[in-house]
Amino acid sequence: HIAELANKNKLYTTYIGLGWYNTITPAVIQRNVFENPVWYTSYTPYQTEVSQGRLEALMNFQTAVCDLTAMPLANCSLLAEATAAAEAVSMMYAIRSRAQQKANANVVFVDENIFPQTLAVMTTRAVPQGIELRVGKYKDFEPSPEVFACVLQYPNSNGNAEDYSEFTEKAHAADCKVAVAADILSLALLTPPGEWGADIVFGTTQRLGTPMFYGGPSAAFFATRDEYKRNMPGRIIGWSKDKYGKLCYRMALQTREQHIKREKATSNICTAQALLATMAGFYAVYHGQEGITTIASRIHSITVFLEKQLKKCGYTQVNAQYFDTLRFELPEHVSAQQIRTIALSKEINLRYYENGDVGFSIDETTDVAAANVLLSIFAIAAGKDYQKVDDIPEKSNIDKALKRTTPFLTHEVFSKYHTETEMMRYIKRLDRKD
């Protein structure tokens, strides 16, 4: 019956973006983790002595998050990017300076180009805490005594990768913490927020091999500075020594957690997306730095190619710097409805803006054939000729100031298991430890 219902759905290719992207789940991870009851039925690893495999897998996830964000500490996942944003606001409220607490500083500045679903959840969670969200342009932000924190999106909801380094300095000078919602795959190419002063970096790892399902779930990530570790939501996996002096994994700093502290807790989060975080960690292990950089570069190259071709058709692209998302102002003789009609006839969903602009986000599954179809939609709408291509050369359009220069995924675990057989044996070795 469920299959019958599912078959009624029309399967279109979606390029809407906004935090959700098609991705390729490596078959070795799908078979040996996602479809394996050893991994999908396991409960919270309270008994560390019978949970070493799961704990190591989650440590891989934390390490990957720390490396990609350039932050010193990460937890082993939260429920979703939007709830991670709400947790970031609650955490920054808890770590206000004494002067801010005395002055009852209760305002968070939020850049207007944050994902709408993230803003909605932050608003829902802020109201009962007495926190006011002030939404505006980050370039117009002026610090004031009542503002204790700022939240930014990187790249923003239009796809523009802004240079927030000056903004962050300005905020810190006014004793404001800065939280950044980041696209984790873009951080393979873009300067990570940890390098330009972010206090908290959060987001989703959905595009690290987690299918979209019915719009969720996927594991959120949350990273912060070491000095804020006791206020961090979620679970943290750490190292310890057993009674024989042997190194082992266990859940660290548990006394700060809500299920132990209860009324004194700064977070009500006592749970995680352990299975999907495990999968994202294995995705990083399987691909390593080189593989993830190749995936990110291919996505960016296709985006650069499409921008160039659509400009030839008379479209104006508004993002100065981007990773995978383009937003176009249309020529006078072209309407968004024309584009929508052509796109739907080709079973494609694009993003349509309220002001009439049209955009799309490229992902890991986009190939040359898909790029040709996207090009054809805009060319036909504009009445222009277009040439199909057989290959798209690697090209970067990222400014030097925004380009990542530091290595990531440098731990040996990320360079040892790059074939299906090696990966399968590693996963099996870990599940035997549980």
Which residue ranges define each predicted feature?
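Conserved PLP-binding catalytic core of the aspartate aminotransferase-like
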Residues: 313-342, 362-366
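A conserved hydrophobic secondary-structure block that centers on an alpha-helix together
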Residues: 64-85, 104, 108
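Conserved PLP-enzyme active-site core in the AAT-like
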Residues: 83-248, 310, 327-328, 341, ...
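Long, charged amphipathic helices and adjacent flexible linkers at domain junctions
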Residues: 140, 247-249, 385-406
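N-terminal entrance/gating region of PLP-dependent enzymes' catalytic architecture
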Residues: 1-60, 66, 260-261, 400-434
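Gly-rich Lys/Arg/Thr-decorated short loops/hinges at beta-loop-alpha junctions or inter-strand turns
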Residues: 36-48, 66-71, 102-105, 133, ...
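Noncatalytic alpha-helical scaffolds and linker/capping helices
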Residues: 342, 351-377
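Active-site C-terminal subdomain of aminotransferase-like
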Residues: 208-309, 313, 318-320
